[in-house]
Amino acid sequence: MLPLSPSYDAIVVGSGPGGASTARELALRGLRVLVLEQGGAEPLQGTVTQMAAMAAVPGKGAYVHRDASLLVAGITAGGSSAINFATAAPPPKAMFERHGIDLAPALAALRAELPMAPLPDTLIGPMAARMMAAAQAMGLDWRKLDKMIRPAACRSGCWRCVYGCPFGTKWT
């Protein structure tokens, strides 16, 4: 239970990757941090029904962009990382270098701490395998993307990542 008159040095809104990372950095510096999350913290079940309840609510988790594309935000603990495919991509190096910012040490520290690596071949789904074969047949450079998962806990053939992994495989 929270104290009656809580005192915090920082309040972070959202527990997705951005909010969680910000809260972590502030806490590591000794600050008292409160994280506010609009969604719940129910255990992920990996079902379409649960995913729809936390991400497909118009005006809350689902938005139609002016180009008619659907933007989906996870309204749950872990934010959108709970309902997406755990793809990890580094920020554009050149953009930061133009401002004199070297991200290499921070990226190396993240890689050492987080489960970030290309998806093992045994976990490549049939559609991704078909895309890879087609790209390679055309002479294109197709590479597996880094994922933030724990491969040992992943179930081959499950493909429930987008619904919210019920096995705790994804780093969310």
Each language-model region and where it sits:
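N-terminal glycine-rich phosphate/pyrophosphate-binding loop and immediately adjacent elements
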Residues: 1-99
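Conserved redox-cofactor binding core of oxidoreductases
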Residues: 102-172
